[in-house]
Amino acid sequence: MKFENLLIEVGTEELPPKSLRTLAESFLANFEEELQKAELSYESATWYAAPRRLALKVNALVTAQADKVVEKRGPAIAQAFDADGNPTKAAMGWARGNGITVEQAERLTTDKGEWLLHKAKVVGVETKSLVAEMAQRALDKLPIPKPMRWGSNKTQFIRPVHTVTMLMGDELIPGELLGIESARTIRGHRFMGVDTLELDHADNYLTALETQGKVMADYQARMAIIKADAQAAADAMGGIAEIDEDLLEEVTSLVEWPVVLTANFEEKFLDVPAEALVYTMKGDQKYFPVFDKAGTLLPHFIFVSNIESKDPAQIIAGNEKVVRPRLADAEFFFETDKKHSLESRLASLETVVFQQQLGTIKDRVERISALAAFIAQGIGADSEQAGRAGLLSKSDLMTNMVMEFTDLQGTMGMHYARLDGETEAVALALEEQYKPKFSGDSVPTQPISISVALAEKLDTLVGIFGIGQAPKGAADPFALRRAAIGILRICVENNLPLDLVDLVAKAQELHGANLSNADTAEQVLEFLMGRFRAWYQDQGISVDVILAVLARRPTSPADFDSRIKAVTHFRSLEQAAALAAANKRVSNILAKVEGDIASDIDSNLLQESAEQALASKLNELQPQLEPLFANADYQQALALLASLRESVDTFFEDVMVMADDEALKQNRLALLSKLRAQFLHAADISLLQ
């Protein structure tokens, strides 16, 4: 068996930087899937990507499929021959289709009967003859939302394709990908190195591109160089570069030959809130901002050039010239905005419609204000400050800065509130009202921020459900799923004594006649419960644990979380499986009972020692369980209930529940009902698998 290294490169025009990595990873994953289908073994595989190329390399790929024997079963012997022993038409047709005669067929005998059998030897195909088709299928399955055509070519791809190279070792694999014939020619950097080069061997791909073409095709190596050089450059300026992963990925996808350079801007711009300057540098220019060790923005930035210039000072000056007017715009917006307080902008909110049926933004902030004050009372916070923060929560939407840089909503509200002399709690709440903004984002922890963040999300959630525009399928234009998860996380992570029923009811009350959906509250609560399930599943919580808690429909998120943790712990106990099965048995018995079950147990009717022991154990645990359930200490309560396992097992072994004597039967049903009720204080344990 022989092995060779395979290289495939698709040379294109500039690929979208935000999807470059995904495209390269998908190309490799799809091709590896093709290799597995073709039963072609290999040692390892990797992907490469640069702005104008996607490539993959497969190491130690077998040069041909292994020969194999394929068994082809024919008709059963009873159908293969007639009464005289002559082959039937079915047998002859099958044999002819396999290129043999019936006499040449073998027999397959099993305990189910006997059949004709042909063992066909299939000679393995050379790998090189399969590569082009496999690569084309891999490319066809790439996640490309809007493919394009170019020239007179009917082929579609994410960008026009100019070169295709497929090499197995030093051998060029003939074939066509995306309408382009495979050749040894690959393109170098647009402005440095050779324009094109001829690749002689798959193993020389990275080296030839780097030394002759001035292209670093190894994405990971390119990213590592940018990160290390940027940190070193910041360190040389006495600062720390802020390198977030998304921007690092994007910059890596924009350059073929990374050269890290540093530049400066005027210190006067530091009077503008740092977030606005950073937003401009990162979002518009793809620069890395530099901070001191205390987290204060410095008047420097780091950028990555795609060319190794003989005069880097000229490139630096050019970037400084480009960023200066953008920072000046931010400065102008800030100075202009400062002339008007957030409170003075409330009137202008009346001119902006939030949603046609739900009124203006002014209507919205008045609802948020009242709801935030209500929530603050429930968590022991200052309701006046919460109401104030709610009222001012959207005023920054009318500022020049936020109109220009929409992602700064909330953040600029915080800065303007401080300038207006609002309390720090109110100012902070204006920024934190939108948290958590994404999965993994932190939640607000200050009481006023919590109140406004919950109110802001509840107002949207209840309002949109109230006008019958709940999310359908993947569509969620008002980001209600994110809002729901935010509500749950804020309540759980801050262990808040809040009930969703009360919160939804208050939000619904504040919307007043705006809402046309009579089932608003019920639908919102159902939606929140569904988000709870999704959130816990994402955390790896077992579905049966979630269902066991959902069966009790606890509407306090903090209480829900306590139950989830308690049942998860209970599930790990040795006694859990037996008690879950017993609960299921009890549930089935009680479900078949017609009429009411007595709430009291008559000790005089406890005849069997097993039922006496179970009743005694329940009575013994009762005074210990009551305070635990009252304090939502479900974990300790379930741990105590786990001690019932032996008594429960013995009861079902020795006691006939459905006794002929009606009084005995009813008393035993009452005992089982009491047992099940204790577990149901926490969750429906019978649902555990």
Swiss-Prot record:
GO terms for cellular component: cytosol. Its main location: cytoplasm. It is found in: Cytoplasm. Coiled coil: none annotated. It comes from the Bacteria. It is an enzyme of class 6 (ligase). Keywords: Aminoacyl-tRNA synthetase, ATP-binding, Cytoplasm, Ligase, Nucleotide-binding, Protein biosynthesis. The keyword ATP-binding applies. The keyword Ribosomal protein does not apply. GO terms for biological process: arginyl-tRNA aminoacylation; glycyl-tRNA aminoacylation. One of its GO terms (molecular function) is arginine-tRNA ligase activity. PROSITE patterns: AA_TRNA_LIGASE_II_GLYAB (PS50861). Tetramer of two alpha and two beta subunits. NCBIfam families: glyS. This is Glycine--tRNA ligase beta subunit. It comes from Shewanella loihica (strain ATCC BAA-1088 / PV-4).
